[in-house]
Amino acid sequence: MSGTNRVAANLNMLFTNLPLLQRYGAAASAGFKLVEVSIPYTEPAEKLREAADEYHLKHTLINAPPGNWDDGFRGLASLKSAKKEFRKSLDTAIEYAKALGCCRVHVMAGIPKSDDDLENAHQTYSENVRFAAEKFKEHKLICLIEPINKYTIPGYHLNNYEDAMDVIQMDQSNNLKIQYDTFHAQQINGQIGAIMRKLKDYIGYIQVAQVPNRGACDTRGEIDYHFIFDEIRSINPSWVIGAEYLDAKPSFNWIENMSLSF
């Protein structure tokens, strides 16, 4: 279907009744040609690439290593105390992105907790993501940052679009973009379409899920996705849309019903 946005399956949140490597086959069987893997580091990069190649799937997005998830880390970029670990995480992200043939890497901000981290969070974050954008540019990778709402991840440093734009406008690499997730946008400020139009030149990737339960786009909730997808299509039909919602055994009728494509 020409002139329509394509949808990528998030393999960390969909098909969760299967091990990660088996989710590639499930995504392909559902019709997908694009996949995103937020946290690919539980498997060797070559195994993920083999699974993708077997089913003719292309990776559209990965996250940089976020720190120890089980210990409560949700990224490292705003943590002064984790500067060395953050820089090392970028090398790992580059290694995986290149192995997977993926051109986008999302750098998570993290949750500053110590007094020193809290006091220096914004400066640390700004310096770190601009460093990441420059470093990724050398490898032809796009650096993404994503505002996340305060209800889903309390204390997350980047929780609004104003701060995201402040950092982007200080970036000299022209390689720092917003990952615009409608699930978060609705809970940060609403006005999903209006904010998206305002930020259209700075958006590098879209993600979607229904609010409040983070379900599929055709489930009941706060967001009218027929309207939102019409808006996305009219603004930029080349944006890739990541289906980042929770569903162990999903159905994807909504993709065709809302005039999107695989």
From Swiss-Prot:
EC number: 5.3.1.22
Organism field: Caenorhabditis elegans
Catalysed reactions, as listed in the record: 3-hydroxypyruvate = 2-hydroxy-3-oxopropanoate
Role this protein plays: Catalyzes the reversible isomerization between hydroxypyruvate and 2-hydroxy-3-oxopropanoate (also termed tartronate semialdehyde).
Enzyme class: isomerase
Upper classification of the organism: Eukaryota, Metazoa, Ecdysozoa, Nematoda, Chromadorea
Catalytic residues (positions): 146 (proton donor/acceptor), 244 (proton donor/acceptor)
InterPro entries, per the entry: HyI-like, Sugar_Epim/Isomerase, Xyl_isomerase-like_sf, Xyl_isomerase-like_TIM-brl
Name of the protein: Putative hydroxypyruvate isomerase
Gene Ontology biological process terms from the UniProt entry: glyoxylate metabolic process
SUPFAM superfamilies: Xylose isomerase-like (SSF51658)
